[in-house]
Amino acid sequence: MRHGHGLRKLNRSSSHRLAMLQNMMNSLIEHEVIKTTLPKAKELRRVIEPMITLAKQDSVANRRLAFNRLRERASVTKLFNVLGPHFRLRPGGYTRILKMGFRVGDNAPMALVELVDRPGVATEENNSASAEQ
């Protein structure tokens, strides 16, 4: 008996779904914030959070596991050299999903997925606040 497993099919074949989530993971690691539909954002959160947890311990085996999922060397390097050390003390909850209303063409619910306490943003906000004073 199948029973429910909490997987969103997103109206795609399994290979298309895996490739889409892989591309979205690479984009989120590279840009640290992406805009997508709400169901895709919720599914992305399920796959990116374990990747960041994996990056908190830098080892060859963990890098190979990450590369097996991401398939992009630059993303793996940033994940282990920047994001892993940045989130080392955070026990989980590395992403934030902000609802952005509805898309004009098809009224699909849109969302902004971003990394919590993004490494580049905190220093820029502090610098701009001190520059204004």
Swiss-Prot record:
Keywords: Ribonucleoprotein, Ribosomal protein. GO terms for molecular function: structural constituent of ribosome. The keyword Ribonucleoprotein applies. GO terms for biological process: translation. PROSITE patterns: RIBOSOMAL_L17. Coiled coil: none annotated. GO terms for cellular component: cytosolic large ribosomal subunit. The keyword Ribonucleoprotein applies. Part of the 50S ribosomal subunit. Contacts protein L32. NCBIfam families: L17 (TIGR00059). Belongs to the bacterial ribosomal protein bL17 family. This is Large ribosomal subunit protein bL17. It comes from Verminephrobacter eiseniae (strain EF01-2). The gene is rplQ.
